[in-house]
C-alpha cells in the first residue's frame, strides 16, 4: 500500500515528467538551432580532452541533438590517438597544445595520467587524503604553453568551453579575455584544496569569470575524499568540483546565442527553469514563441 501510494502520487508523476521533458525539448531546440544558419554547427572547446573510462564527455548529449564540432587540447599523444580511434563519428580536431599563459613550464606526467599537470603535487595535501595518496609523478618534460586567445583566434563563437587541466584553470582563463568575450557557457574543474603547488582555487576562478560577464549557476559534480586515517567510507573533505557558468544574457547582443544557452541548459544539465527563463528572453527579443514548448 505504501509503495502504491508513492508510485501513484502526484509528486512521482511530476518528477517523471521532469525526466522526460528534457529529451523532448533537446530534440526540438536542437532542430531549431540547426535551422539557423548563423548558429550551426555548435562549437565545443575541450581543454584537457582525454576520454575517461568511467564517464562520457559532459557535452555528449549536446552533440547527440544538434550539429557540432569539438576542438580539443590534449598533450598526451596516446590519449589523443585513443580518442580519435574511438570517436570517428564526430567532427573532432585534437591538438597537442598545452593551454596556459604562454610561458614555459615543467609538465608533470603522473601515474594516473588524468592528473598530469603543469604544476607539481602538493604532497602535504595529497598524502593526507585516502583517494590521492598513491598519486606520484613518473616523468617530466619542459613545455611551452599557448594562450587560448592564440590557440583559437580563428573561432568566432565558443558555445561550450570545458576545462579540466588539473589546477591550471586560472592562468588559462586569465589569458583568454578575447575567447571569454565570445563564449556562452564555461564548464570548469575547480579545486577547494591546493592539490598542486601554486595553484589557484575556486575562490580565485569565480571572481575572474564573473568579471568577464559570467554567472555562476551550479556545481555539476562534487568530489569528496576521506582522510588517510579513515574510515574510507567517511568522505569528509570536499576537494574539487565542476563549476558551471553561463554568460549573462544582458551582455549578449545576438539573440540566437541565448537560444543556444537554453539548449545547453536543458540538454547537458537538465535545468528546465533556467532554459525557460532564457527562452523567454529569446522570444522577447526575436518575436518567437518557443516558450510554448514548455507547456506541451
What are these regions (language model features)?
Residues 6, 10-296:
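Phosphate/nucleotide-binding beta-alpha loop and adjacent structural elements of enzyme active sites
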Amino acid at each position: 500500500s505504501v509503495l502504491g501510494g508513492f508510485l501513484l502520487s502526484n509528486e512521482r508523476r511530476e518528477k517523471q515528467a521532469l525526466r522526460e521533458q528534457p529529451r523532448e525539448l533537446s530534440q526540438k531546440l536542437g532542430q531549431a538551432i540547426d535551422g539557423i544558419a548563423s548558429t550551426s554547427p555548435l562549437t565545443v572547446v575541450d581543454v584537457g580532452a582525454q576520454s575517461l573510462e568511467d564517464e562520457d564527455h559532459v557535452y555528449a548529449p549536446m552533440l547527440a541533438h544538434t550539429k557540432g564540432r569539438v576542438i580539443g587540447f590534449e598533450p598526451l599523444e596516446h590519449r589523443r590517438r585513443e580518442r580519435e580511434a574511438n570517436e570517428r563519428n564526430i567532427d573532432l580536431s585534437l591538438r597537442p597544445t598545452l593551454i596556459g599563459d604562454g610561458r614555459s613550464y615543467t609538465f608533470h606526467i603522473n601515474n594516473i595520467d588524468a592528473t598530469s599537470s603543469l604544476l607539481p603535487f602538493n604532497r602535504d595535501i595529497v598524502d593526507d587524503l585516502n583517494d590521492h595518496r598513491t598519486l606520484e609523478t613518473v616523468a617530466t618534460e619542459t613545455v611551452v604553453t599557448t594562450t587560448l586567445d592564440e590557440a583559437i583566434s580563428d573561432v568566432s563563437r565558443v558555445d561550450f568551453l570545458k576545462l579540466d587541466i588539473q589546477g591550471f584553470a586560472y592562468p588559462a582563463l586569465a589569458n583568454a579575455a578575447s575567447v571569454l568575450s565570445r563564449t556562452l557557457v564555461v564548464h570548469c574543474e575547480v579545486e577547494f584544496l591546493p592539490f598542486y603547488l601554486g595553484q589557484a582555487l575556486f575562490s580565485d576562478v569565480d571572481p575572474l569569470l564573473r568579471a568577464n560577464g559570467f554567472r555562476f549557476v551550479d556545481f555539476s559534480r562534487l568530489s569528496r575524499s576521506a582522510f588517510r586515517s579513515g574510515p574510507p567510507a567517511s568522505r569528509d573533505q570536499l576537494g574539487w568540483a565542476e563549476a558551471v557558468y553561463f554568460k549573462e544574457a544582458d551582455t549578449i547582443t545576438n539573440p540566437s546565442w541565448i537560444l543556444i544557452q537554453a539548449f545547453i541548459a536543458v540538454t547537458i544539465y537538465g535545468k528546465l527553469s533556467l532554459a525557460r527563463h532564457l527562452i523567454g528572453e529569446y522570444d522577447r527579443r526575436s518575436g518567437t514563441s518557443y516558450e510554448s514548448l514548455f507547456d506541451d
